[in-house]
C-alpha cells in the first residue's frame, strides 16, 4: 500500500474512532456564561474584557480555568474567549456529556480558545483531551493541537500547534479503552 493510501486510511480511521468520543451536555448552551478572576478590565466600545489571575469560566457544566483570558463579544452577544495558562501550568476545561451515567470530557493545553456560539474549544500546544465515565478514563487524545466540537460529538488532533499536520512534525496519540467484557458463555448441560 502506498504512503498516500496509508495516510488516507489512517485519517479516515482516526475520524471514525473520534466521532462520538465526546458530546457536550446540550443544556449548557442555554446557560449564562460566568467569568471570575483576580482582576478584570472592560472596554465597552471594543466589546472586550481582559481578566488576569485565577480565571474561571463556567457555563452550565462547562468549567474552564487559566491564568489569563481575553473575552470578545460579537454584535449578537456571543462571546469568544482565549485562555492562556499561567507559567509552568496548563489551561483546563471540563464539561459533562449527554448520556446515561456520569460522563465527562476534560482537556488541557497552554492556550484554549472557546467560541460559545459554535461551542467549539480549540486546544493549542501540549493539548490533551480525556473522555471519562465517572473518574475512569475511557478514551484519550494527545497532540500539539486538538479541536473539540461539542455539538457535533467530534474532536480532531493535529501534530502542529496551530492546527495543521505535516510529515515528521510530531505525532497524535489516541488511547481507546476496551468496552465492557462480554459475559462468559453458559456451558451447555
Stretches with model-predicted labels:
Residues 1-189:
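Mature-chain termini and adjacent capping regions
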Amino acid at each position: 500500500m502506498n504512503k498516500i493510501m496509508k495516510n488516507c486510511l489512517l485519517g479516515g480511521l482516526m475520524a471514525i474512532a473520534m466521532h462520538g468520543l465526546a458530546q457536550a451536555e446540550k443544556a449548557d448552551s442555554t446557560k449564562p456564561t460566568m467569568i471570575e478572576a483576580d482582576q478584570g478590565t472592560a472596554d465597552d466600545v471594543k466589546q472586550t474584557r481582559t481578566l488576569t489571575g485565577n480565571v474561571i469560566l463556567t457555563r452550565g457544566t462547562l468549567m474552564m480555568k487559566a491564568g489569563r483570558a481575553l473575552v470578545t463579544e460579537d454584535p449578537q452577544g456571543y462571546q469568544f474567549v482565549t485562555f492562556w495558562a499561567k507559567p509552568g501550568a496548563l489551561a483546563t476545561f471540563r464539561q459533562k456529556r449527554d448520556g446515561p451515567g456520569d460522563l465527562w470530557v476534560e482537556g488541557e493545553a497552554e492556550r484554549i480558545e472557546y467560541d460559545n456560539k459554535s461551542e467549539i474549544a480549540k486546544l493549542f500546544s501540549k493539548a490533551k483531551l480525556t473522555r471519562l465515565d465517572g473518574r475512569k478514563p475511557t478514551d484519550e487524545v494527545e497532540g500539539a493541537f486538538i479541536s473539540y466540537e461539542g455539538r457535533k460529538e467530534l474532536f480532531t488532533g493535529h501534530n502542529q500547534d496551530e492546527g495543521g499536520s505535516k510529515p515528521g512534525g510530531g505525532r497524535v496519540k489516541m488511547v481507546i479503552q476496551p468496552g465492557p467484557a462480554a459475559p462468559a458463555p453458559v456451558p451447555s448441560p
